[in-house]
Every structure is written in structure tokens, then in C-alpha cells.
Amino acid sequence: MKGESDFIDALRNRVNRDRGTGRQGETEITPSARLPVTVSASLIAGIGDDAAVFRSTAGKETVITADLLVEDIDFRRTTTPPYLLGHKALAVSLSDIAAMGARPLWSMISIGVPEDVWQTEFVERLYDGVLDLANRYGVQLIGGDTSRTNDNIVIDSIVTGEATAGMSVLRTGASAGDQIFVTGSLGAGAAGLRLIERGAHLAEQNLGDEDSQKLDHILLRQLRPEPRVGWGIVLGEERLATSMIDLSDGLSSDLNHLCTASGVGALIDSALLPIDERVTELCGRRALDPLQLALHGGEDFELLFTVKPADVPRLPRRVDGVGIKCIGTIQSTSEGVKISEGPRTWELKPGGWKHF
């Protein structure tokens, strides 16, 4: 790669040009069709200026989130293709915006890399992953920064979104009697990490075709998480969710975060947890516990949300092909946060990811 200015010029030109279908390659992990980047009339200045400038929208409130990915803490260069790393860097921030019931609009990606990495195609492939995901959700890359590091790669992702004024979904709105729902399935993000730690790679050749597909599905839930942007928008704009959080740290930890913020307790039923069936099958072979992965593993990036009983019939069954499952009920704070398994009930303590 040439210098930073050349890279910025190339990135700006790519973001601004009118694009249709994409490049060849990465067929098993790249969407087959690429949508054009949405260029909003609200954007006054983007990539190439000292800062981005955009007009505020009347009747809207701005939602902003930031996420930091650090090599050897959040990912390993040896097991994460740069395209997928770019995808995940943006996906984790889109998941936060979805958890607020907001619509994502703008993104800024900053990256620090060692000089030997800068001299390869790594950074371009990383931004390919960012831009492909951004295109899918009409998000425009409007800036960021690049810098040199001594050893490890560091990626900072900032995403800005909008919600109708007064309609952002917070963690603080749950009340006793609300039903607790999750999108999608649980456990695959953590199972994928366990497989990577044990040396698994995409499309392992020593397995049969069906087993390889199952393994790749689990690995990609870790390497290429899918943010539930559509569900977030529906739950926010239709005023369906009373509270919401994304499942990045693990169900046990994130449910406790939500209950603490709302000043409530909760009871969930382990039999109702939508554990990915491929995870259950894998755990039987690899001496892993699917319930523990679903409760404490984290990195599923599903949405956990609460709904008043009267609003449950209004919930769509699926959004963007993803369903939901009721897993329990919000209770009074005196009841604590608990989980049941048959006749047995116990306290569900936070057991997920801890940053420090």
C-alpha cells in the first residue's frame, strides 16, 4: 500500500462512486450482491475533511456508540480473515444501535496497524468487509483515522444512528410482568470461539460436507456476527420494547445489566432458551455444555428485550428471516434474577465476559 493520503483518497472514491454488484472471490463468506452505499442529503462533508459534517434531523434524537477491538484480546490475526474482521468491527457497533431501537446512518472506522501489515492488502480487505456490511444497512462511512502501532492491530468503530424523539429504547424501562424475549439463537458465538481456540478453521477438510457446513456456521457466528438491525428498528419505531440490550457479554451478564438498570428482577426458563441445534450437536462431540455457552458465553449479538403482555400479540413472528422466543418474565426486584430448570430454581449470577 502507498501512503495514508493515497489510501484515504482511494477509500473516499470507493465510498462515493456508484456501485452495483461486487467483486469475485470470498464466495462462501461474502454476500452475492452488493447494494450501493446510501449517500444522504444530510451529509455535508465526509471522508477527506478534518471532520464529518451533517445536518440534524428535526424530530429525531441522535444515538452514538463506539467499540474497540484489540488484537489478541478481541481477535487473533492468525484465525480471523481481514474481510471478516472488518465485518465484525462494524457489526458489533450496529448491534448496539439496534439495541437502542434506532436506525443506523453513519460510521467511522479508525485503525492502527504495524508497518508490515500496512504494506499488505490486509487493510483494504478489512475495509471491504466494513463497506459490504454498511451497504446492506444503508450506512455511510464518513471518516476515521489511521495510525501505526508497534505490534498489535487496534480497530475503533463508531456508529451514529437516529430514533424518533423520545422513542430510543433504554435498559431502564422494564416493569414487573413484562415478557422477556430474545432474537435468533444462543450459544453459537461462544461455541465458535471455543472451536477457534482448539485450532478449527473455516471449511475443515477432514469432515464430511454436512459436518463442514455445520462447523462453518458455528465459526461464522463468532467471526461474522449478524447484527439484528431490522428487529431493533421494528421494536423501537413500533414502541414494542419497554427495554432492550444486545447480548455481547452473555445472557447471564446482560440480563443482570438490564434488571439492575430497570430496578427489577427476572425469572427465565432454561427449557425455553433458543440454543442453536448445531451447538447442541457439537457440544455432544466436544465435551461442551450448551446451556453454559448460551448463558455465559457471549458474542451472540442477539437482542434481549422486554414487552408488556398487552403488546405481545403485536410482535411480528420474524424480521429479516430471524424469529424470536419468549424465555421468561420480569419480576419485582425482591425476587432477584433467577433461572429455572424443571422443579429447580437458582440465582442467575453474571458469568459472561468481563473486560477487566
Spans of features found by a protein language model:
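Compositionally biased, low-complexity intrinsically disordered regions
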Residues: 24, 32-34, 106
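Extreme N-terminal cap/leader segments of soluble proteins
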Residues: 1-20, 26-29, 39-81, 100, ...
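Glycine-/charge-enriched secondary-structure boundary and capping motifs
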Residues: 1-13, 17-18, 60, 80, ...
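A short, charged helix-loop
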Residues: 204-226
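Residue-level signal for inorganic ion chemistry
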Residues: 53, 93, 101, 141, ...
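Glycine-rich anion-binding loops of enzyme active sites
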Residues: 69, 103-199, 329
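Internal active-site segments that recognize and position negatively charged phosphoryl groups
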Residues: 181-184, 224-251
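Alpha-helical scaffold segments that flank or form the walls of functional sites
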Residues: 84-100
